[in-house]
């Protein structure tokens, strides 16, 4: 049976949604237009979305970078939004989601492997050869068995790090050269080859905000910055199955 009251409610709901969508699209268009006009060199905008604060919008650029603006882009805010009730850094939470790395998305062709035991468990590691914490981490990892380590050379500590990483990548036995240097302080032998993989690692890390070494990525996507010990690695490996 036709119900005028219910039909009217549905019509109002649809109309309200339509008006909201139009307003949202108008805000999106206004922000994009004004930022482009006022900042000709402004990066291409990936997405404009609402924030929990009325009238404030998130503008995402370069894949993972976030700024905030009002609906007309008259004011721009760089920094974090904090939810004081929940005690949560909303910007940090959002950035974590944007920079999450699925293991399947890792460019494994740009890594070399160190296999221990049956190699069934998987860990990706981004390390700089001049990183003291990385050397400590490598020593600890000798206690972790039955795992394959995908080693990404990630020289972010200066020109010498780049030179060493390039030489390590060009070594005949990358895994041996790496462990000789990191564990036994054996000098890296100069070598030459196509080192584009090392440069790609740096670009990949910048994109996903890998800001320090070592950084670990487990098979389930868990990302851990810092030189955690073998016990902590084993615990994460057990839960990442």
What is each residue range found by the language model?
Residues 168-170:
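Conserved NTP-binding/hydrolysis module of P-loop NTPases
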Residues 12-21:
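Bacterial N-terminal signal peptides
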Residues 172-175, 179:
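Conserved, helical-rich catalytic subdomain that frames metal- and/or nucleotide-binding sites
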Residues 225-226:
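Short, exposed beta-strand-loop hairpins at the edges of beta-sheets
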Residues 2-7, 20-166, 180-183, 187-213, ...:
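Extracytoplasmic thiol/disulfide redox context detector
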Residues 62, 219-220:
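Short strand-turn-strand beta-turns centered on an Asx-Gly dipeptide
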């Amino acid at each position: 049976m036709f119900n005028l009251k219910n039909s009217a409610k549905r019509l109002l709901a649809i109309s309200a949604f339509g008006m909201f969508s139009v307003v949202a699209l108008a805000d999106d268009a206004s922000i994009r237009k004004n930022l482009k006009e006022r900042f000709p060199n402004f990066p291409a905008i990936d997405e404009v979305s609402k924030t929990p604060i009325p009238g404030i919008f998130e503008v995402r650029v370069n894949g993972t970078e976030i700024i905030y603006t009002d609906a007309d882009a008259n004011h721009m805010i760089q920094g974090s939004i904090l939810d004081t009730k929940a005690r949560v850094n909303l910007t940090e939470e959002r950035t974590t989601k944007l920079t999450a790395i699925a293991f399947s998305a890792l460019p494994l062709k740009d890594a070399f492997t160190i296999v221990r035991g049956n190699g069934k468990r998987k860990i990706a590691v981004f390390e700089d050869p001049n990183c003291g914490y990385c050397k400590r981490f490598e020593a600890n990892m000798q206690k972790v068995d039955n795992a394959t380590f995908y080693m990404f050379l990630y020289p972010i500590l200066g020109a010498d790090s780049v030179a060493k990483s390039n030489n390590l990548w060009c070594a005949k036995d990358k895994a041996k050269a790496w462990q000789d240097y990191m564990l036994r302080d054996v000098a890296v032998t100069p070598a030459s080859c196509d080192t584009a993989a090392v440069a790609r690692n740096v670009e990949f890390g910048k994109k996903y905000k890998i800001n320090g070494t070592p950084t670990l990525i487990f098979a389930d996507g868990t990302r851990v910055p810092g030189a955690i010990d073998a016990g902590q690695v084993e615990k994460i490996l057990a839960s990442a199955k």
